[in-house]
Amino acid sequence: MEIFKLLRKDRKMLFLMFIGTVSFLFIFIPFLKFQMIGSSHKINAYPSLSAVCGLLLGPIYGFFAVMLVTLIYFFLNPKAFYFGIYSLIPPTLAVISAGALSEGKWKYSAIILIVGLLLFYLTDVGRVAFYYPYLSTLALLLILIFREKISKLLFSKDWKKMIVGATILSFSSVMTDHLYGSILGIVYLHLPAEDYISVIPLFIKERLIMTVIGAFFVIFAIEISKCFLKNATKLKEKLLKSYIDKEIKINCKNMLNVDEELLKKYNVKIPSEEEQKEILKTLVEVVVFNNDKDENR
């Protein structure tokens, strides 16, 4: 179950999550910086936060959160943004990619990376340092291989599967940010191919560190949400109702293709929407009860 997608349906929870994420971004962004290639500027590790931001808020609200924080920092200290206003592009695309991927909409994440790779190879630097974005290519391959399974891995009970899902989510968002940042370095700062080639060992280390940090935040957010939901009875009931309503709507659409004459012939009755809701509610409650029972053993 996509916990955060359901949580966002509650306006109060959405507001709290949005404010909490924005505050978290403000606190974390000034720390953990890396030297930028071909420049005296330093890169801070905000790409580590793209995955958890996209996970918590989704692609749309995550986009607005990152945009808000980045714009405020831009107006406070524009010199720190070495690509000018275009510095907004990498983090926003990274959080959109992470948000889409966490909801099982892997095609959007794949498209963002494919477009970035095409843009990179259209440049002179891309044709010379053609092997430079191989980690971004690896991220794309992971998305194409795992697809919607990434979302399922994230919310798996098996902690090993959760780590795999969190790592893929973090790695793909970090490499999306890196790819578009590299393109801006070519277009905006006119960095030569030699700079990109010479820095390959350094950026591998940087991005892997960011991936690990990002995966940690993702796992932490999921575990905290599970503990919270376990003890929030009213919210759990509201989310359960929302989930059931969604499932019933899908089932009702599928039932439009049922042959009514065939049902009458064999005296088969399809339960009403309310009856289906009660049945599904009972089943979900039994499953939740058994899960809680197993965890307490």
Swiss-Prot record:
The chain crosses the membrane at residues 14-34, 55-75, 81-101, 110-130, 135-155, 163-183, 208-228. The keyword Transit peptide does not apply. Keywords: Cell membrane, Membrane, Transmembrane, Transmembrane helix. One of its GO terms (cellular component) is plasma membrane. The keyword Endoplasmic reticulum does not apply. It is a multi-pass membrane protein. It is found in: Cell membrane. This is Uncharacterized protein MJ0923. It comes from Methanocaldococcus jannaschii (strain ATCC 43067 / DSM 2661 / JAL-1 / JCM 10045 / NBRC 100440).
